[in-house]
Amino acid sequence: MRNEVKLANPNYDSSKIEEFKNVWVFCEQRQGQMMSTSYELISEGRKLADELGVKLCGLLVGDNVGDLAESIGGYGADEVIVCDHPLLKNYTTDAYAKVICDVISEMKPEAFLIGATNIGRDLGPRCAARLHTGLCADCTHLDVDMPIYKDFLRGASTLPEAKIDGMATAKVMGKDHDVSRDLKMTRPAFGGNLMATIICPRFRPSMATVRPGVMKKAAYDEAKAKAVKVTKYDVKLDAADLQTEVVEVVKAAKKLVDLVGADYIVSVGRGISKDVEGGIKLAHELADVLGGVVGGSRVAIDSGWLTADHQVGQTGKTVHPKIYVALGIS
């Protein structure tokens, strides 16, 4: 049954795409600290909003998080919509999904970007299902403007020039559809062996989760931070809306590998298979000397040589270190 969960706007219809406007970014915070990926997406969202000629809005959800709105404006947001409520202090799927879907059903953005963090990967599909729209997961590139998208294809694909030049429409339900205002979401497919570009032509908002680290964070602008418009959304939420309760937040004793933020990475791959123990040891020693971290290819992870948080590449984390050393990776 369509839209089984009640939304704040009972007349919401995702197929009436002409009613949707503006680009939104979910600005993820944890314990009052903004996630870096949120600033990356605000910077990317600024580009998309400019291409569409619309506003860029940051969506900030939590408890007493209004003070973070200014920093979101500093990276390019025109407006920050703040959803403040005590039950939003700690992330729970039920509470965040309800509030986000409520505000979207009322304000109707045409595009909604979410960081592909653990929270974003949980939240995105739930919201897309409730809002009866499409979600492209784990994106590494976004475009709206066709000339810009075509330039991207020329540099990132093997498509012939005639094929790229002829792109203007797509077949949707057997009819030609003008893709000029559609968000073009590119992501790895088939285990990272191909890149696929996906559009959501029949419903809005177009939703995408985006890998942390793939979008460039803009320079912070103090003037924009001071000028950002802050709108407080009237959150309607009570304990009955939640099926779970966060009793305590315990930080992991084991520190996860920060590949995305690392300046120096030493990665290992299939080529160390003749001496895995020696290869891994060498990688760690070199990483320690450089003050960096150890990464690995998909083969290294699938073979159990390293844990999944070390994986680099199309099917792992996208990284931008100052120095990247590849051992046994072709």
Map each language-model feature to its residues:
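N-terminal glycine-rich FAD/FM-binding segment characteristic of electron-transfer flavoproteins
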Residues: 1-330
